[in-house]
């Protein structure tokens, strides 16, 4: 009898990188959890099925306190895929692994450019990047165009994604390489996550997160502001916290000194 020998198939191991939300709690943790609950209550499903990294580098907590924090997040359906900034002594079997090597900032040179005009004539803009955190800041309104004079930054090669159809409830569009433009509306329960700016030529009723990989010069433009949640470079705010006169209006938003500013467009 003849034996046929075959080599076993090799196991293929590949590396991939994925976009994950990074939560950076601050002390006291109970107060931070209350703010997180407020975010979740006003933006249902925000954390559902989303990979989350817990950054504890700035927290002086023990292993038991870390386990309790992870349990609190788990009870809120926040699934922690890994820990960042944790000491090895803080982690035991059954806890999420320690992650290293995350890059909150894009490795693209960012030259300075002059500010651009509002969205109807506006061209693609984008820039540098950082991670999202769970803190919030006030949205300021301004009637003066001089409040926008801070020069945005742009990549030498700008990339963009153009969507010619409305984004329906439950859909998630993630494009970290540059700007996202939607020729239509974004429904409640839908979300747009862009590495650059977001341009919506319709009603924004879902979630819009610009500068998701740390582009502080990113902006959000929409023809009708009714958003569930807005974020630029990890600073988030609910649209209902905006001045009432801006709701339902064409609006642009940008980040200035870690505060989201908003202005009505003509």
From Swiss-Prot:
<dbReference type="GO" id="GO:1901891">
    <property type="term" value="P:regulation of cell septum assembly"/>
</dbReference>
<protein>
    <recommendedName>
        <fullName>Probable septum site-determining protein MinC</fullName>
    </recommendedName>
</protein>
<comment type="subunit">
    <text>Interacts with MinD and FtsZ.</text>
</comment>
<dbReference type="InterPro" id="IPR016098">
    <property type="entry name" value="CAP/MinC_C"/>
</dbReference>
<comment type="function">
    <text>Cell division inhibitor that blocks the formation of polar Z ring septums. Rapidly oscillates between the poles of the cell to destabilize FtsZ filaments that have formed before they mature into polar Z rings. Prevents FtsZ polymerization.</text>
</comment>
<dbReference type="InterPro" id="IPR005526">
    <property type="entry name" value="Septum_form_inhib_MinC_C"/>
</dbReference>
<feature type="compositionally biased region" description="Basic and acidic residues">
    <location>
        <begin position="109"/>
        <end position="124"/>
    </location>
</feature>
<dbReference type="InterPro" id="IPR013033">
    <property type="entry name" value="MinC"/>
</dbReference>
<dbReference type="InterPro" id="IPR007874">
    <property type="entry name" value="MinC_N"/>
</dbReference>
<dbReference type="GO" id="GO:0000917">
    <property type="term" value="P:division septum assembly"/>
</dbReference>
<keyword id="KW-0131">Cell cycle</keyword>
<keyword id="KW-0717">Septation</keyword>
<dbReference type="GO" id="GO:0051302">
    <property type="term" value="P:regulation of cell division"/>
</dbReference>
<dbReference type="InterPro" id="IPR036145">
    <property type="entry name" value="MinC_C_sf"/>
</dbReference>
<feature type="region of interest" description="Disordered">
    <location>
        <begin position="98"/>
        <end position="146"/>
    </location>
</feature>
<dbReference type="Pfam" id="PF03775">
    <property type="entry name" value="MinC_C"/>
</dbReference>
<keyword id="KW-0132">Cell division</keyword>
<dbReference type="Pfam" id="PF05209">
    <property type="entry name" value="MinC_N"/>
</dbReference>
<dbReference type="GO" id="GO:0000902">
    <property type="term" value="P:cell morphogenesis"/>
</dbReference>
<comment type="similarity">
    <text>Belongs to the MinC family.</text>
</comment>
